[in-house]
């Protein structure tokens, strides 16, 4: 980057003053905020769950409150917990001034229940779907998927975590006390003005990248926990930024789950990637340490911060995701890390079809075509397996609704251990091969979508439509 003479003089003057008058961005790095834990909503006894989409007030910087969008009166929504074999009635109420559609990424549902064009909720209206929960335990997320407006709607705050539990997860010796040793950790990046108001000006040829890392809506959060294992349910709800997470002292994460459920066994990983839309569950051993810090790469240096005064920066002011502080003595009864979690015995029948998917780089579209709500791009059959080969010259995440898949290879090489397990979102940097199971039916007027998970690219047309013919037709 080059500076004009005037900018150079300004930067030089500011640099001389750093020691005497620290910049706000510099001072804020060391301020810690208790991690906000979203309220927990559970389906019990057939009672409906109410989700009101409305304006709210929130502080992103700990100083100024600003108007945001939210769910049930706060930025981001409550965490919803449901159980396998529940039939969950939702009541979405739109109290905003524009149409919104909502979906739950990770829930295995028919196309009639996945939001989108046909399920837009007009201002002042409700949508009351009944969702049959028939899948194994998983960490999912619900969010706006409004046609051509998904990126700004998610950025403004229409998102939350959705947990599915089953008998297996209930009986495993894993941390499961919500907000005590089992935490939702929702990562986003924003750009805030001097009054803590989010700015949203995405580049015309890519997705929005901010310079301020937020976790559950705040900067530099911490939690206090008892000694023992803790569980973090990680969700990347950013529009376009991918994170590389690690623990500051070099210890490993013990990864136990990915997008669509638990892994057969815990996997120790030193560094964890998290693309937009991806979820991962990890355990961290806090039995012997007083403090552990989870980070997302390098923080901005002084010069990067100074540059950010003159032009938008994409370097994170602070890379701290979460500081974990252990208190008290180790309990006399502690659970060891289980060596086995679940049996993955899904039978794979023969693959009936191979498909090639090409994601355009800086121009929107899939296989050279922009999204058209009146066009079906792929027709498949429920209960069958397909091999999808997804290509991207510019790295980006890719998501498919209504299916579950496993990553078979990435650029001809076996997947990394952190990419084991059933998924619905994958990072594509070159060429990936996916084994896709067509789990749910969809229809011409209620198709599944597959799209670039860079939300601005999806809004511009990097979306295709999938009809999965029901098994009895």
Swiss-Prot record:
GO biological process: FtsZ-dependent cytokinesis
Function: Cell division protein that is required for growth during stress conditions. May be involved in protecting or stabilizing the divisomal assembly under conditions of stress.
UniProt-listed Gene3D superfamilies: Cupredoxins - blue copper proteins (2.60.40.420)
Molecular function as annotated in GO: copper ion binding; oxidoreductase activity
CDD domains from the UniProt entry: CuRO_2_CueO_FtsP, CuRO_3_CueO_FtsP
Description of post-translational modifications: Predicted to be exported by the Tat system. The position of the signal peptide cleavage has not been experimentally proven.
Subcellular location: Periplasm
SUPFAM superfamilies per UniProt: Cupredoxins
Pfam families referenced in this protein's UniProt entry, alphabetically: Cu-oxidase_2 (PF07731), Cu-oxidase_3 (PF07732)
Key words of the record: Cell cycle, Cell division, Periplasm, Signal
Species assigned in the record: Photorhabdus laumondii subsp. laumondii (strain DSM 15139 / CIP 105565 / TT01) (Photorhabdus luminescens subsp. laumondii)
A GO CC annotation given for this chain: cell division site
Residues in the signal sequence: 1-27
Protein name: Cell division protein FtsP
The keyword Lyase is assigned to this record: no
Chief location: periplasm
UniProt record similarity statement: Belongs to the FtsP family.
